[in-house]
């Protein structure tokens, strides 16, 4: 058997194995949807390359490229991981692994990682990265061919050496080069305070494990001081622990569905509010924006769909899936999304169509460009975007108005 034949057999078998795994997980390998026909086209293309390409192709590069393209075109939150990537993925922790302190996504239509949110006090926030920034390259290496695990991997190493990022910001024609230290990010604290009219304000920057217990303690203290209403600020709250999201929503619900999880081959798992975990029945308004993603979206949807309170702001990002790591014989692995989170009303938080993803607020309040803090315009670090002054914060002001006078909800919807 010549080397080209060996190459063809290896590549076909590798892709078939991966295709079978992904198809089996997602329930997509069937004659009805034309999957096998697409495989035959792939094999025809492979045959043409084998017979007509000017040089003998690199087996490793071809196999890796074919598998990577297959996985990431099917699943933007998945990826083909090398053995080195697998070790990093299993040990990764946002607050224990060196990095830049940013929550990232890789929208399939964009092809590059984008910043959803930055952790207050983290190196990305201090360096001026903002939600919506596109990371075009890291240390001169393009990120277009990287999955998110690989992006975080290169952002964590080498430790102590700043990462040189080429960033594309909105409304700017040319990329900016930003140097960001690689360092351990500290978990941000919950912020609570008493606003006017006895309204408790609770800001949750990140839903890490244990944060719900912290919210319970601090909010309970405000309730005992006379708070009669609650503003739960989940703007720029991305990522986090899904279990914490369920627990946080349960603080405001004594019954009903909080969310459910389901996939093609993943049995439906429903999360229901427990009356014993209820903290308060006080009126609540939840603040959200385009950087509200993941666990925070579960909370907002639970409050909204159970008619427990108003959700104020703009449509959220739309991220809510569960990944499974599938080991392969050579130490590499597939990271595949196997289930998605659904709202109590049955809507996918992370829809196939990005336009349908996310949670729409009951009261939409858009922020004007002038109300968005730009690091170049003022000596204000990006974390200040989370909490503009009360005079500037139209979303917070409207939430307060609604809590003080619920009759203003309909007027607000018309105005928005």
Model-derived features with residue positions:
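Terminal targeting/pro-maturation regions of precursor/exported proteins
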Residues: 2-79, 111-113, 389, 394-398, ...
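Cleft-lining beta-strand/loop regions that shape enzyme active-site pockets
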Residues: 22-38, 44-54, 58-59, 114-118, ...
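Extended, small/polar residue-biased N-terminal targeting/export presequences
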Residues: 53-116, 160-179, 186-192, 400, ...
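Short clusters of hydrophobic/aromatic residues that line enzyme substrate/ligand-binding pockets
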Residues: 80, 258-259, 271, 317, ...
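A polyampholytic, Gly/Pro-enriched intrinsically disordered region
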Residues: 278-286, 331-340
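Conserved functional hotspot residues or short segments at active or partner-binding sites
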Residues: 333, 340-416
């Amino acid at each position: 058997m010549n080397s080209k034949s060996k190459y063809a057999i290896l590549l076909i078998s590798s892709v078939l194995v991966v295709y079978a795994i992904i198809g089996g997980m997602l329930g997509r390998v069937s004659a009805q949807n034309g999957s096998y026909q697409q495989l035959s086209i792939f094999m025809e293309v492979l045959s043409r390359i084998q017979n007509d390409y000017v040089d003998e192709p690199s087996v490793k590069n071809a196999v890796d490229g074919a598998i990577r393209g297959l996985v990431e075109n099917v699943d933007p939150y998945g990826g083909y991981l090398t053995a080195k990537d697998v070790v990093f993925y299993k040990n990764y922790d946002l607050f224990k692994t060196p990095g830049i302190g940013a929550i990232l996504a890789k929208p399939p239509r964009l092809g590059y990682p984008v910043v959803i949110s930055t952790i207050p006090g983290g190196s990305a926030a201090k360096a001026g990265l903002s939600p919506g920034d596109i990371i075009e390259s890291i240390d001169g290496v393009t990120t277009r061919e990287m999955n998110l695990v690989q992006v975080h991997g290169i952002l964590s190493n080498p430790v102590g050496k700043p990462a040189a990022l080429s960033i594309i910001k909105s409304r700017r024609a040319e990329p900016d080069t930003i140097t960001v230290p690689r360092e351990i990010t500290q978990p941000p604290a919950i912020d609570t305070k008493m606003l006017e009219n006895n309204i408790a304000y609770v800001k949750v920057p990140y839903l890490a494990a244990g944060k719900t217990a912290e919210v319970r303690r601090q909010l309970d203290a405000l309730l005992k001081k006379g708070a009669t209403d609650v503003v739960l600020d989940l703007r720029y709250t991305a990522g986090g622990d899904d279990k914490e999201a369920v627990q946080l929503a349960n603080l405001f619900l004594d019954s009903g569905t909080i969310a459910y999880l389901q996939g093609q081959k993943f049995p439906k798992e429903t999360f229901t509010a427990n009356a014993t975990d209820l903290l308060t029945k006080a009126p609540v308004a939840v603040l959200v924006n385009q950087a509200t993603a993941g666990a925070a979206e579960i909370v907002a949807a639970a409050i909204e769909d159970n008619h427990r309170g108003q959700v104020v702001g703009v449509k959220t990002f739309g991220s809510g899936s569960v990944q499974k790591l599938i080991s392969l014989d050579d130490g590499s692995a597939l990271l595949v999304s196997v289930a998605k989170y659904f709202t109590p009303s049955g809507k996918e938080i992370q829809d196939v169509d990005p336009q349908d993803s996310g949670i729409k607020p009951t009261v939409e309040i858009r922020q004007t460009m002038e109300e968005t803090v730009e690091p170049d315009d003022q000596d204000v670090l990006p974390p200040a975007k989370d909490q503009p002054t009360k005079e500037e914060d139209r979303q917070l002001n409207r939430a307060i108005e609604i809590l003080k006078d619920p009759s203003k909800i309909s007027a607000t919807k018309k105005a928005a």
